Amino acid sequence: MDVTWTVKYITEFVGTALLIIMGNGAVANVELKGTKAHAQSWMIIGWGYGLGVMLPAVAFGNITSQINPAFTLGLAASGLFPWAHVAQYIIAQVLGAMFGQLLIVMVYRPYYLKTQNPNAILGTFSTIDNVDDNDKKTRLGATINGFLNEFVGSFVLFFGAVAATNIFFGSQSITWMTNYLKGQGADVSSSDIMNQIWVQASGASASKMVAHLFLGFLVMGLVVALGGPTGPGLNPARDFGPRLVHSLLPKSVLGEAKGSSKWWYAWVPVLAPILASLAAVALFKMIYL
């Protein structure tokens, strides 16, 4: 299968939308008044985000499944992804996050109207550090704690992601192996050679399937372990896109309790994961590649 870059952009859009539907859908189920899981276990959110990463990775890993601008930038900065496609990937990821969030709002709108806590409403869209109590005096502490939390969690995520996967997936494995063998002077038109390529690619894809499952559980573990201070972030598109949706939607949609989108904090879940990704991918490449 010859996968075009246009297909990859669309896949990043779809994959990021799925992440938001599963992840922020779980948050909405727990945070919004009147839902079946209102005020229930944080594990629901952990499972939601874990599956939100796992499902796109398993479904689209043979095409593309970065679904995170920070990861895309980290790979590009380390020479593992072409810079020519970074902007398109990030745009697709942010738009996918916004689309997924709009679907969540559509499904949960009656419960937004019932909810009286503005932080609970915002929490179903984007993150905010719990040090913040709507007092400007707490903003510095919230910013510092939030940045540290996002950086540590994102570093673990991206280091684990690079360790568990590599740039070649599915059909790309076949293309890479074919070009490599051509460069070595092999006759790739030979049926025996092509059979060997397909066997190797199939084995690599099977290994990556396990890696994708691992990534889902890694995200779930990080949400459970480090989600307490800020909520599940680790992804600039996951925070910025839904936060923008929150700021644009009127109270007639989200209810009279809709509060501030807290743009003063918005740079934290964008910049911290990006810096963590650059550091994690560079460190992994320096040690292992």
Curated annotation (Swiss-Prot):
A single GO molecular function term of this UniProt record: glycerol channel activity
NPA 1, short sequence motif: residues: 68-70
Protein name according to UniProt: Glycerol facilitator-aquaporin gla
InterPro entries named in the record: Aquaporin-like, Gla, MIP, MIP/Aquaporin, MIP_CS
PROSITE patterns to which the protein is assigned, alphabetical: MIP
Sequence similarity: Belongs to the MIP/aquaporin (TC 1.A.8) family.
Keyword Transmembrane in record: yes
Transmembrane segments: 10-30, 41-61, 87-107, 151-171, 209-229, 264-284
Motif (NPA 2) on chain: 235-237
CDD domains with a match to the protein in the record: MIP
Single Gene Ontology BP annotation: glycerol metabolic process
Listed SUPFAM superfamilies: Aquaporin-like
Note on domains (UniProt): Aquaporins contain two tandem repeats each containing three membrane-spanning domains and a pore-forming loop with the signature motif Asn-Pro-Ala (NPA).
KW Cell membrane (keyword) present: yes
A UniProt-annotated Pfam family: MIP
Subcellular location: Cell membrane
